Amino acid sequence: MSDSNIILPRRRFLTGAALGGSGLLLAGCDALTEDPGFRSILRTGEALNKGAHRLIMDRGALAPEFSESDISPVFKANGSISGGTPEYAAHVADKFARWSLRIDGMVKNPQNFDLKTLMGMPSREQITRHDCVEGWSAIGKWRGTPLRLLLQAAGLSTRARFIVFHCADQWGPGMPYYESVDLIDAFHPQTILAWSMNDGILPVKHGAPLRLRVERQLGYKQAKYVMRVEATDDLSKFYGGKGGYWEDAHDYDWYAGI
């Protein structure tokens, strides 16, 4: 399959749907998208899309997987291409030998996993397509630790509803990149914290040492440079309160299912 497939950005699709098929597809920078009433329409469309997606797809349904011959020769490194902090640079310099992933929040037994331990755990390999909201896509091969194993090891609370991923890259003063998913996606068999890409160690530009792969959602949900995983029952307490950097800063959909 070619990696040149173009997908319609979901915000434009939802805008068109919310306007009753009038054919009016507005760019994200259009002044109308700043109107509170219009934003409410978009949020309603997002909720409808999420509900339809859950109804149509079984909670365990897999995203399409591909063959080795489908792997894209070029996989664009989008967004940050470095963690951007002195602490992260030090981890890169010593090849993450002293780095560890923290699992905490609403868990019974908070855990720390170093990279060697993560690589020694049961892993999953998958060749999947990364679909960017900008309209490009690429196919890559990923191997990593299933997120559900880490949450189970930490004893996830029955009161937890969301999993938040705290990342090393900074997108402004006091604004590190972060993302979140619900428990359906957190426990999905294809949701992994990837430490390998295309049979090699995950490159820095693609999010080393760990990158979230949540294969049934758009690219901005695939958080890079994951440093900490936190279980919570409420997303409103984090930064702008919408569950992710792009959601907070640019009103992207929190649920980006495809």
Labelled PLM ranges:
Residues 19, 109, 156-157:
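Short, well-ordered coil loops that connect the C-terminus of an alpha-helix to the N-terminus
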Residues 11-12:
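N-terminal Sec-pathway targeting helices
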Residues 20-24, 139, 154, 219:
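Generic hydrophobic alpha-helical segments
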Residues 30-153, 224-226, 232-258:
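Near-N-terminal "mature-domain entry" segment
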Residues 1-8, 19-23, 27:
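N-terminal secretory signal peptides
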